[in-house]
From Swiss-Prot:
Quaternary structure and interacting proteins, as annotated: Homodimer.
Keyword entries, A-Z: 4Fe-4S, Electron transport, Iron, Iron-sulfur, Metal-binding, Periplasm, Transport
Transmembrane spans: none
Cellular component GO terms, alphabetical: periplasmic space
Organism of provenance: Isochromatium buderi
Coiled-coil annotated spans: none
Main subcellular location: periplasm
Protein name in UniProt: High-potential iron-sulfur protein
SUPFAM superfamilies the record matches: HIPIP (high potential iron protein)
Length: 83
């Protein structure tokens, strides 16, 4: 179930960052970022994901204040989380 405070893919910031809830539907192959192969890039291993906000498959993201992103998502700002 999608939480009411989840980022929608039509959100202006989401559009600008090419965010998709399902990384497999994103442009991550064409716009892959350094750190991991494109197929391994998703919100769950991104430095912008906020692990203490949200629950289940949904977490906070510093790029979308006050909203939740899907851990299986991807956006063009993906950056490998340290550690």
């Amino acid at each position: 179930e999608v939480p009411a405070d989840a980022v929608t893919e039509s959100d202006p910031t989401a559009v600008a960052l090419k965010y998709h809830r399902n990384a497999a539907e994103s442009e991550r192959v064409a716009a892959a970022r350094p750190g991991l192969p494109p197929e391994e890039q998703h919100c769950e291993n991104c430095q912008f994901m906020l692990p203490d906000q949200g629950a289940d498959e949904w977490r906070g993201c510093s790029l979308f204040p006050g909203k939740l992103i899907n851990l299986n998502g991807w956006c063009a700002s993906w950056t490998l989380r340290a550690g």
